[in-house]
Amino acid sequence: MKKGCRICVQEYLSLFPALAVSYYSNKKGLKSELGSDRLLGVPLETYIPSEKLAIESGSADENIEIMKAYMCKQRGIRLIKLPMKGTELDYANNLKKAFQSVHIFISSDTEEDVEIIKNTFERWRDSQ
């Protein structure tokens, strides 16, 4: 990421939660869907079908959030709310704990993981 480009940094930070879920899912051989609305008719930020697990970092309109929670419950999907607070490292550590809560154990160097995610984003950004 170009130093000082606030737009690039903002875009990276807004995408980081979904990129991190995707990265850790891949690490465990799990397929993840990003922004898919095929299940509920409203988009889930990230969804791991084999685990029936949805992880969301942001929040939309309160009514949409209530509806999502209800629809996930009806379909037996565990919905974890994990807001992006603090640094990417904080989020990645909290995400690993969230995965652990559903018996998905990830042992890796979190700082290294964050660097890999950032580099992946930069390569994608440069290719656009």
Give the ranges of each region predicted by the language model:
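Nucleic-acid endo/exonuclease domains
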Residues: 1-128
